[in-house]
């Protein structure tokens, strides 16, 4: 059994994919060929934004967004603590400081209440300028953008949507009444089965990004990424930054940029895959996820999809009682030939790369300088079992913020992702669920 069966997908799409790749190879236009621009137009139309600019990978996409906004030293960028490393990695690369924010237990996405607390702490400290919030559409589910946007607007923050895992997800948007009394539609798409317009992932941020890493909801056969925005000025800057800071032509370099282009072969592959994704893959993976939930909801904490939200299911992630139960289940699944993954085993605020107080945040310490969160003999992160830790440590002079992010820390010890993809069979789902029941019954 495959965790994400890319080989099966290729078998289904082989004829179209081979034809597209051979066409790109025969064209001789391997960099920024016509398929790249065609794909950008198709992606922009699918998402419902004015501009889509492809690039080399999802990490570069985030970097390009920060560059377009001029983010740098002295700026605070708020990032969920429970996510892939690159969501925060790009911040210190631009000289700015990541400030980690806790997430919701139910959805795994950024907690807007904790975001506001973190912004207030940064403002009270007075050393950093709050500039950006990175909202991650984790595991395919869009973040709560209504709540995130409310905080962002109150404090003048830009919203960067990290849709690396979220492409294809959506939220039904309530209609709003304008000053003239007329109804303003919440979005440009009406999805099947919805009685209200739905806004798609990668259209919620002031700038949004995605990744085309092969295992993503929409993936190529290498690396790739894209940036989405409705802002003409930012789009022009990103277009410049992605090709060495070019001006009117590629040898007119007006700023320091990157070499970050999606090649023509990958664009041709993505054109084929986007068609399949929109026509049936997104529906099929949602149907498969529903089968998992129906079979498992009485024995384990299954993913929560809020009313009006739709996930693209980059992962199907269950929650166990504790690390011991999670590890035992993973071992039992492995013994039966069933793959599973832990996304993610360590919260960002405990990553070694962010231990330098001039880079990120450090975990809370007691009066002797001892880190209050420690690892057990198996390398798992454990909270102290006493009442001396309030989960909101007092600020230390050398740190930007000492939010422990207890929910994120706990999730890292309890989450387990199961095999899921658009081509998984009901028999395979039953095999996984029966194996889980053997352990948890």
What positions do the PLM features span?
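Structural detector of well-ordered beta-strand residues that form the stable sheet scaffold
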Residues: 53, 78, 99, 159-160, ...
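PLP-dependent aminotransferase class I/II
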Residues: 36-42, 49-50, 113, 132-136, ...
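Active-site phosphate-binding strand-loop segment of PLP-dependent enzymes
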Residues: 106-220, 227-228
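Hydrophobic "anchor" residues on beta-strands that sit immediately upstream
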Residues: 1, 76, 157-158
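Phosphate-binding glycine-rich loop
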Residues: 28-76, 90-94, 100-102
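Conserved coil-to-alpha-helix start sites within the AMP-binding
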Residues: 83-88
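Short beta-strand->loop structural element characteristic of the AMP-binding/adenylate-forming
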Residues: 81, 97-107, 341
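N-terminal "arm"/small-domain region of PLP-dependent enzymes with the aminotransferase-like
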Residues: 1-29, 34, 419
């Amino acid at each position: 059994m495959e965790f994400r069966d890319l080989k099966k997908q290729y078998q289904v799409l082989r004829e179209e994919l081979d034809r597209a790749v051979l066409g790109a190879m025969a064209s001789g236009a391997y960099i920024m060929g016509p398929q790249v621009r065609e794909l950008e137009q198709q992606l922009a139309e699918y998402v419902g934004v004015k501009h889509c600019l492809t690039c080399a990978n999802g990490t570069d996409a985030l970097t390009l967004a920060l560059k377009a906004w001029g983010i740098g030293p002295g700026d605070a960028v708020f990032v969920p603590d429970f996510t892939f490393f690159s969501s925060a990695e790009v911040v210190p690369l631009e000289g700015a400081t990541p400030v980690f924010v806790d997430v919701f237990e139910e959805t795994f996405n950024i907690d807007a209440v904790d975001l506001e607390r973190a912004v207030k702490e940064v403002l009270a400290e007075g050393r950093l300028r709050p500039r950006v919030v990175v909202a991650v559409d984790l595991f395919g589910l869009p973040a709560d953008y209504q709540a995130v946007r409310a905080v962002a607007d109150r404090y003048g923050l830009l919203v960067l949507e990290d849709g690396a895992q979220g492409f294809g997800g959506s939220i039904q948007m309530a209609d709003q009444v304008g000053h003239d009394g007329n109804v303003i539609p919440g979005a440009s798409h009406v999805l099947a089965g919805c009685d209200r317009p739905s806004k798609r992932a990668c259209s919620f941020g002031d700038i949004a990004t995605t990744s085309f890493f092969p295992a993503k909801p929409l993936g190529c056969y290498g690396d790739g990424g894209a940036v989405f925005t409705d802002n003409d000025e930012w789009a022009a800057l990103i277009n410049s930054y992605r090709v060495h800071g070019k001006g009117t032509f590629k040898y007119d370099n007006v700023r320091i940029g990157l070499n970050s282009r999606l090649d023509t072969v990958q664009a041709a592959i993505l054109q084929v895959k986007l068609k399949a994704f929109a026509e049936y893959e997104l529906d099929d993976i949602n149907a498969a996820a529903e089968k998992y939930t129906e079979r498992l909801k009485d024995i384990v904490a299954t993913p929560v999809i809020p009313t009006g939200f739709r996930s693209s299911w980059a992962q199907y992630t269950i929650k166990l009682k504790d690390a011991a139960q999670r590890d035992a289940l993973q071992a039992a699944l492995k013994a039966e030939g069933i793959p599973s993954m832990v996304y993610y085993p360590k919260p960002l605020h405990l990553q070694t790369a962010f231990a330098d107080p001039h880079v990120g945040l450090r975990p809370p310490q007691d009066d002797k300088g001892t880190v209050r969160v420690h690892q057990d003999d198996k390398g798992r992160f454990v909270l102290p079992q006493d009442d001396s830790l309030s989960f909101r440590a007092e600020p230390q002079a050398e740190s930007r913020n000492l939010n422990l992010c207890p929910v994120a820390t706990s999730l890292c010890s309890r989450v387990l992702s199961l095999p899921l993809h658009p081509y998984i069979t009901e028999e395979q789902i039953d095999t996984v669920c029966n194996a889980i029941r053997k352990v948890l019954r």
